[in-house]
Amino acid sequence: MSQLDLGTQSLELERFPPQENSNTLQAWEAADEYLLQNIDLSQIDGRPVLVFNDQFGTLACALHAYRPFSSSDSYMSQLATAHNLRLNHLDESAVTLLSSVDDLPEAPKLVVIKIPKALALLEHQLRALRRVVAPDTVIIAGAKSRDVHNSTLQLFEKILGPTKTTLAWKKARLIHCEVADIPLADAPETIDWPLPNTDYIIHNHANVFSRNNLDIGARFFMEILPYDVTGKIADLGCGNGVVGLIALEQNPLAEMLFVDESYMAVASSELNITVNRPQDLSRCEFMVSHGLAGVERESLQLVLCNPPFHQQHAVSDHVAWQMFCDAKRCLKAGGELMIVGNRHLDYFHKLKRLFGNCETLDSNQKFMVLKSVKQASSRSEGGGSGSLDMSYSDF
């Protein structure tokens, strides 16, 4: 937990999900401070205030008195925003949480943007803004200086209007943009490409990992996916759903759950099944969730996972660890977790400690595919759909 002093208010902010041994990672950054110092609150006239990509809810908490709309592709960021509003005893209902696929409010007076990691997501958001902004909408964006490039400024200028940047402050930089009536060619909502060695066409929304081609880890994983599994299979952290798509084809008696914390990932997965295997839609469920938090314990036969080892710009295997613990809770006795991961992450020993067993199914110079089986003697993980009661530090 860290404290952000804004002069007129002080906020206690925490990263989400809460992590042990995370004292070096705070829930806000200099760009948040810089943005809040440079917003002229006197300009807010009762029209909507709109915030984008507020990772842990810092901006929403600071601007809660103006009842902001907060748009994000990340369900985890939405949970973090709600968590930090509660932590500061602020009214959760004062902030309207929007997903990246929701419509934006018309004619906002103030738009505050944290520059996202993916330039394609920024372009999507700026194009969505163009459809709703008014001539007097105030637009201000911020990021670490290293993340504000000429291409970033050019996007603002091409889509919205004249753009200028500030001097750096604490290694952060701001962007000010004016709305202008400029011509702009249409752009498709998704991009598509053929999936190698299949007849499938993959469609990706803006914020999907490895948007322009097949992720090399997924490619390696897909080569050894099992056949003829019965019961329910989860593609955990599904991205665009390519792993689940192949699993769906190879396991005609199974049901498939696609789950991710990215709204655009889940939307892409659903689109890819609809386009490529419409006959199998009745066997599929699509869920935006924090891991398997919404899934009943001991309900899955197989969990497939290509876990992330970053949370935005921070390197961390905490999210992957939560996925593994969730998988153990949700697997039936005898059910299997199969993962693909970079060799240097040492998932083998973590899974062996958690499940009591781990097998290397395949490996190359960069990746390993591992399998763990849930034993019938595994200790009870509790009921309902909560997380496994086990600390990361235990391992």
Swiss-Prot record:
It catalyses: guanosine(1835) in 23S rRNA + S-adenosyl-L-methionine = N(2)-methylguanosine(1835) in 23S rRNA + S-adenosyl-L-homocysteine + H(+). It is an enzyme of class 2 (transferase). Transmembrane segments: none annotated. Its EC number is 2.1.1.174. One of its GO terms (biological process) is rRNA base methylation. SUPFAM superfamilies: S-adenosyl-L-methionine-dependent methyltransferases. GO terms for cellular component: cytoplasm. GO terms for molecular function: 23S rRNA (guanine(1835)-N(2))-methyltransferase activity; nucleic acid binding; rRNA (guanine-N2-)-methyltransferase activity. Signal peptide: none annotated. InterPro entries: DNA_methylase_N6_adenine_CS, rRNA_m2G-MeTrfase_RlmG, RsmC/RlmG, SAM-dependent_MTases_sf, Small_mtfrase_dom. NCBIfam families: PRK15001.1. Specifically methylates the guanine in position 1835 (m2G1835) of 23S rRNA. HAMAP family: 23SrRNA_methyltr_G. This is Ribosomal RNA large subunit methyltransferase G.
